[in-house]
Amino acid sequence: MNQMKDTILLAGLGLIGGSIALAIKKNHPGKRIIGIDISDEQAVAALKLGVIDDRADSFISGVKEAATVIIATPVEQTLVMLEELAHSGIEHELLITDVGSTKQKVVDYADQVLPSRYQFVGGHPMAGSHKSGVAAAKEFLFENAFYILTPGQKTDKQAVEQLKNLLKGTNAHFVEMSPEEHDGVTSVISHFPHIVAASLVHQTHHSENLYPLVKRFAAGGFRDITRIASSSPAMWRDILLHNKDKILDRFDEWIREIDKIRTYVEQEDAENLFRYFKTAKDYRDGLPLRQKGAIPAFYDLYVDVPDHPGVISEITAILAAERISITNIRIIETREDINGILRISFQSDDDRKRAEQCIEARAEYETFYAD
């Protein structure tokens, strides 16, 4: 029975599930994690990398061995698995959680179909990466990130505390809220911004016939502010459909906002135009800089360097000597409102700060942030 108590079934062996597993292993080395994934390649990799200890033959066969179930799959598949659990006939108690980006539909369904001996705590670790797959999993992925917990109507407080203890190796900041509040907050700061980014890209694409140079000049700041439009189309289709009501509310607000600024422009209302941008600037400048949020952060450093051969290799050699890893490096051709022509992206703010100090000390180039 003790073996079952210390066994966790992880369904979904991608970046998020794999990172949770590594964090649990770090803090609870006695736990046994068995895994299952729709991709045999991911399951084999997870076992080889030590992310899991064993593979399950099926979802339900894995649940039969475990006391805790972590469902790290898209929301649609999570709902399918909850239904399988409801009809499994498994008699022992279970602690169940998920990692989905929307919570109301999942938590409501869990309340509806699961027996009381199965305690479900909705979960949403608000951190990610620009990489995917179990090979990109890191035990520190959620460090200092918000990890939202959304208990259901039938969830005991003890189950929430039990889950927090299991996940404390993530070093995340746990925040409890209702599923409805979660979906409202994320619709504002994550879901709707993805729609806006995608719509800006569509607008640019449609403008190419009229302005053929649009694509070339969009390589600078425009590309930066629309980065999130490169996210998984399938994932964002599902997120919007599962958070439909909140998203429709955001559309209504956005239409009112656009109508307002359009009126200011139409009427050449300089005072209100200034106030509009000043209010936005002040609010954005007051947002936390170092707290991880719902959208993966980009830790970019801009380096003002002369345009001559060998500059990029000089910079990368400095960083390599200090063992500072970079995720991307590129030259910015369109530099309106951006200081510097070389942009280097890092995995963390600490790496960016170290790089800034090294470059300014050893190469005497001026560096800037555009946060």
Swiss-Prot record:
Gene3D superfamilies xref list: 3.30.70.260, 6-phosphogluconate dehydrogenase C-terminal like domain, NAD(P)-binding Rossmann-like Domain
Keyword flag Amino-acid biosynthesis: yes
Annotated family: Belongs to the prephenate/arogenate dehydrogenase family.
EC number: 1.3.1.12
Any one GO MF annotation of this record: NAD+ binding
Pfam families noted in UniProt: ACT, PDH_C, PDH_N
Name of this chain's protein: Prephenate dehydrogenase
Residue ranges of every copy of the ACT domain listed in the record: 300-371
Residues the record lists as binding NAD(+): 7-37
